[in-house]
Amino acid sequence: MLSGYSEPLVWNKLSLAPLWLRGKFLSLIEREKEHAKNGRPARIIAKMNSLCDPGIIEALYDASEAGVEIDLIVRGICCLRAGIKGLSEHIRVRSIVGTFLEHSRIFYFENNGNAEYYMGSADWMPRNLDKRVEILFPIEDPILQEEIYHILHIQLSDTKKAHLLMPDGHYVKAVSYTHLRAHE
């Protein structure tokens, strides 16, 4: 499978593109949507470099309309519009461009209080989900999960280098009386 030309094997925990990764992400987003519709805790935090896949964006809009709280940390291109009433009012997008060129892709799904953490190589872009060999794997160790949650919290709290995506598509600098920089 590593070449992309061989017969797919059965994988227990890994999700690979171009075969299963899109479906995995869509099912995780859909599960959060169902939790929200049924009044259960539902939240998505995703950190990546780019978000421009129409199918993923549509799924995020649907999840937002159902009440899922969605925080996206997207360093580069983001084709999603956040904060639009009736469409994406539960979605917040921030971009952090600091000292380091980060390439981490981290995904958190609240899952009704049974949080699931994933890391991988793919951004939410058609070329990553459909045309490249990419991987997603779960983080199951509770100590690592705690560390990852801490990292995400720091990223979401950054007020020094973060810019917030507005509903009209432009970014504004995050402001706060406390200055926290994620890249320190």
PLM regions: where:
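A glycine-rich phosphate-binding loop feature that marks nucleotide/adenosyl-phosphate handling sites
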Residues: 13-21, 47-53, 77-80, 166-173
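Primarily the HKD phosphodiesterase
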Residues: 27-92
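Hydrophobic pocket-lining residues within nucleotide cofactor-binding pockets
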Residues: 51, 124, 182
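Active-site cores of enzymes that catalyze phosphoryl transfer or operate on phosphate-rich substrates
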Residues: 1-28
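HKD (HxKxxxxD) catalytic microenvironment of the phospholipase D
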Residues: 1, 5-8, 96-167
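Conserved structured core elements
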Residues: 19-27, 42, 50-58, 71, ...
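Conserved small/polar residues in nucleotide/adenosyl-binding loops
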Residues: 178-184
